């Protein structure tokens, strides 16, 4: 484990890490979980939340909501309610977000490219708090206006300011499996020569299952395109705030090195890890 930490730390020092930030980071500052969002969708449809949750998984329930909203008004963007709800919760928690130690530590890693499957602006707010320039990217137009000095925050599943970009229903997830969207092509290029670090994810999160599948496919495509051997693939890591030997085994089978936290408090565990891997700090 010490060897993995040392290699990861060196990769961060050399700006050779793609950081993926998951929903666990946003939830730690009071933003809604998927379960809370599903409850709100049930409320919108006038369905008992317990019954709603019994009738399908999160993606199929979101799909049902999208179908119902489209039938009521085809002009409505189904994800608009989700976007508005998250935006409102973010406004309520702004002080907590801008003072969150974990978010400050993420910014202080100085990773030039951060991917996130979150729709919120926590990362943008954290960069602004520390007066560090960043550019959120959720479509081709954003890519054209990136300055080299800016940290790129790739909104891989959309941004609440752009409801049409949001990936939240079953069909929208399936659409992203084609691997040929502009963001997929960018990811394929960004992966070359870089390690990947996931934080804020667990196997119960559909995003990590999709991402690990997608990344494996993209690596195989890169290997074919550029003649890269499997041995030349940089290491990928996932931080797990709590030990879970089943999840660890699954991640290892997907060529992702699990690094397990040492505290029962998930937030403290994540903070301790981010401190250890920051090459600017003496640990």
What is each model feature region?
Residues 1-3, 96-97, 136-138, 177-181:
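Short gly/ser/thr-rich secondary-structure transition/capping motifs
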Residues 1-19, 25-29, 40, 44, ...:
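SIR2/sirtuin-family catalytic core signature
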Residues 1-107, 112-115, 123-129:
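Gly/serine-rich nucleotide phosphate-binding loop at the start of the catalytic core
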Residues 33, 100, 168-170, 244:
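Residue-level signal for threonine
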Residues 121-122, 161:
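A short acidic, glycine/proline-enriched capping/turn motif at secondary-structure boundaries
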Residues 151-173:
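Active-site-proximal helix-loop elements at catalytic-domain edges
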Residues 168-185:
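Active-site glycine-rich loop that binds ribose-phosphate moieties when present
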């Amino acid at each position: 484990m010490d060897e993995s930490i040392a290699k990861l730390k060196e990769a961060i020092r050399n700006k050779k890490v793609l950081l993926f930030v998951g929903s666990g980071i946003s939830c730690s500052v009071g933003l809604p979980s998927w379960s809370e969002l599903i409850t709100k969708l049930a409320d919108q449809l006038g369905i008992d939340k317990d019954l709603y949750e019994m009738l399908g998984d999160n993606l199929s329930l979101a799909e049902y909501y999208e179908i119902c909203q489209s039938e009521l008004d085809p002009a409505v963007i189904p994800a608009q309610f989700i976007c508005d709800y998250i935006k409102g919760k973010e406004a309520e928690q702004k002080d907590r977000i801008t003072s969150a130690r974990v978010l400050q530590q993420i910014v202080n890693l100085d990773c030039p490219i951060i991917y996130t499957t979150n729709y919120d602006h926590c990362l943008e707010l954290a960069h602004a708090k520390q007066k560090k320039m960043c550019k959120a990217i959720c479509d081709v137009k954003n890519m054209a206006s990136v300055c080299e000095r800016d940290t790129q925050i790739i909104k891989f599943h959309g941004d609440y300011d752009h409801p049409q970009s949001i990936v939240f229903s079953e069909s929208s997830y399936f659409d992203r499996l084609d691997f040929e969207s502009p963001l997929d092509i960018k990811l394929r290029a960004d992966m070359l020569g870089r390690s990947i670090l996931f934080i804020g994810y667990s196997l119960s999160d559909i995003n990590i299952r999709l991402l690990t599948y997608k990344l494996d496919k993209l690596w195989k495509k890169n290997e074919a395109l550029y003649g890269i051997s499997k041995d030349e693939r940089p290491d990928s890591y996932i931080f797990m705030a709590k030990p879970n030997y089943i999840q660890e085994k699954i991640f290892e089978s997907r060529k992702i090195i699990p690094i397990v936290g040492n505290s029962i408090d998930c937030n403290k565990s994540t903070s301790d890890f981010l401190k250890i891997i920051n090459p600017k700090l003496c640990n």
